[in-house]
Amino acid sequence: MTWRSRREALRAILSGSRCARPASVFDPISMRIAEDLGFEVGMFGGSVASLAILGDPDIALITLTELAEQVRRMSRAAALPILVDADHGYGNALNVRRTVQELEGAGAAGLTIEDTALPQPFGEATPQLIAIEEGFGKIKAALDARGDPTLVIVGRTGALAITSLEDAIERAQAYEAAGVDALFFTAVKTRAQLEAIAAATTLPIVLGGPSEEISDWDYLAAQRVRIAVQGHAPIAAATQAVFDTLKAAAAGTPPMQLQGLASSELMDWVTRAALVKQRGANFLGLKK
């Protein structure tokens, strides 16, 4: 699957009538597992990227180069379309252009640009938002930088958790006017909030962590939600598994008695061992 076909697959989700559950992915193996299990799209969250690449919390320490290289590795490993959290675009509107170019070249099917002021400004104890005008400019810059018109650009606002529903809607309308392909909202908790957002906008909606009140997939689909992020449990599960295994090993548990390990069959599957062996036979004269 080419980069463009992945982007077209993401666009098909956004233009459809269902709400998709994305797989939270963070490396080549998680990409392959998600693809093999039948997920339609992967979400590479900013917090997950910070954990996977730096081992740091989500405080905007990661660089564009680090993010793009990880996306490139993931894109190479599987054909699953990836929606990448590009945070604030790593700077101003001109930096956003570079961000789009790098992530497009790395194989991202789509990316989100948000209006949170990152990194956190000096002296501010709580998250802040950039001005609507600056956010509008960032979206216009992102669209201008796009080499492949099928690359999905998503405008994201965190206003609902910081200012108000009215501000979130005003920002979303500005990003829609700028030409984004979809709108991403965080901190939507109630049906009333979601219905107000859906009524005030026309584009496909992506939700970050919908609350229990609105976690009905038919309802979400009816409100034009096409992707609903379900948190990032896989990297937490992987972290716990590594911790438990190393804890047992440190306590003296023999390797053959360690619990919860992937079988050799699963390891062969996720590493595409049979394909690598076939290539060895084809190109190195090795026996199958």
Swiss-Prot record:
Keywords: Decarboxylase, Lyase, Magnesium, Metal-binding. It comes from Rhodopseudomonas palustris (strain BisB18). Mg(2+) binds at residue 85. Its EC number is 4.1.1.112. The keyword Disulfide bond does not apply. Catalyzes the decarboxylation of oxaloacetate into pyruvate. Seems to play a role in maintaining cellular concentrations of bicarbonate and pyruvate. Its cofactor is Mg(2+). This is Oxaloacetate decarboxylase. CDD domains: ICL_PEPM. Substrate binds at residues 47, 156, 232.
